[in-house]
Amino acid sequence: MSALSTKLEPTNSYSESLPPQRRSPLEAEGRYRWNRGNYSITRRRIDIWGFVLTLLYQFWLNGKKWSYAGGYTEEKLQQRRRRQAKWIRENLLSLGPTFIKVGQLFSTRSDLFPAEYVEELSKLQDEVPAFSYEQAAGIIEEELGKPIAKLYRSFDPVPLAAASLGQVHKAQLHTGEDVVVKVQRPGLKKLFTIDLAILKKIAQYFQNHPKWGRGRDWNGIYEECCKILWQETDYLREGRSADTFRRNFRGEDWVKVPRVYWRYTSTQILTLEYLPGIKISHYDALEAAGLERKELAQLGARAYLFQLLNHGFFHADPHPGNLAVSPEAGELIFYDFGMMGEITPDTKNKLMDTLFGVAEKNAERIVNSLVALGALKETEDMGPIRRSVQFLLDNFMDKPFEEQSITKISDDLYEIAYDQPFRFPATFTFVMRAFSTLEGVGKGLDPDFNFMAVAQPFALQIMNNSNGFNPAGNIMDELGRQAVQVGNSALGLPRRIEDSLDRLDRGDIRVRVRSTETDRLLRRMGTMQMGTNYVLFTCALVLSATLLFVNNYFMAAAVVLLMSLVPAFALWRLLKRLERQDRMF
């Protein structure tokens, strides 16, 4: 089996995305147990469950104030979470492809995890060794049914990039076209099958957990992860996504998308047009090529708004490794179409209803649209959720436009979601993640870049076209819209009254009249009375132990002193309960 090495251009974004130590075909020498052909399934279970149970112990420890040296503070909790987040990221890397991808998916789920974990998971990049050229060639020949020499005029044995799911080689077809060949990692589907079976048990454990299962659909999250992971192993699907993406930008000369060579593509092999470019985060190279960084930042934002608003089909992983710029014309080049998002027309309409609610600062409309989207679970009392949304609106809308940040908005939204029954669909989190990542890329190119400022004209145009909001202040249109809204509310009122009465009949709604302040004071007085009893009991035992000790009854004194620890511990528990009650009111 022969192969001809080809000299790689320095502007190739695939090679630039690799750390220096990985720009050669690193052999998988058993550094990771999952990478061995004969790894033990039992050992795999031990590795995964060991990680999960250790993580749960750390979560439990976070809530224990005695575990903080020098006393608990919010700052110490954040510092501990940051350390834990790094530990989580390192362990996900060592657990291999399945958990690297799960970690990357969880980096979009700030509604599930604290901000410190999500921030660290967003840095999670594939750091696994490349597999050998012999393995890659064997997979290509088995999938395409021909020897390497008959398929390609030349094939570089040194991968341009290696990741958890596969690696990319440069090659040249016999017809003269330069291509990149993406080869799936050997044994990947077997590993996914084992890992996902274990993850199913973990999801069930979390679902039944008294704290972590409350208000969370872990089984649904597991199913979502399964779907996305298996989709990423199908390179035919990725090829179709690349084709659709290329078609959507066909009339735009400022974006380039690689062409798929279907004759050289299968479920485990993807052959794409070779489009070299300057990595979008290599600022010195961009300036040396005479490209304007500020314009590139605007171009990236424009490309994503075009994807989302014009076609509803968008690239869900726009990190700098997947974006490059052609040095000649400054065109934006997209790579890697394994993770794509799609918004259906119905979802788009519901999202627009949310946007209208934001424009009107109408928390009621936003909450109703989020319920319709399936992003919010309807509860008996939606009042706290409406107040949380209204608080976010008041803080967001009252700021000058240039101070608004898509990252800050999504962080605030996720902070509310973390304590409320939100369950953001994957598409929503992909959109927020893509926009947040893109804002980071834009600020790297231009420190003054503001994604919201770029998005404003697009949003206003769509709202005008939808007749949902008229910033120009056309009074008659606005009155007509308000009349329709009032009419809809009036028509829906009998149904809402009937629903409320039905819920009263079923006992789902309980009406209770009480004095909250009086109840609180009575509870506090009862607790303090009990605390006084514990203090007296403890003091009596300590005094008894002291008298016994003075009279040389050392053993009896030790026993009585140990007995005094029981009411002392009960007193400590009582004081903690009082502290919690004070925080609640």
Curated annotation (Swiss-Prot):
Q: Where is the composition biased (Polar residues)?
A: 1-18
Matching entries from InterPro entries are given as: ABC1_dom, Kinase-like_dom_sf, Prot_kinase_dom, UbiB_kinase
Q: Which SUPFAM superfamilies match?
A: Protein kinase-like (PK-like)
Any one GO molecular function term:
ATP binding
The annotated region (Disordered) lies at: 1-23
Give the matching Pfam families: ABC1
Q: Which family, according to UniProt?
A: Belongs to the protein kinase superfamily. ADCK protein kinase family.
What PANTHER family does the record point to? CHAPERONE-ACTIVITY OF BC1 COMPLEX CABC1 -RELATED (PTHR10566), PROTEIN ACTIVITY OF BC1 COMPLEX KINASE 7, CHLOROPLASTIC (PTHR10566:SF113)
Protein name per the record: Uncharacterized protein sll1770
This protein's species is Synechocystis sp. (strain ATCC 27184 / PCC 6803 / Kazusa)
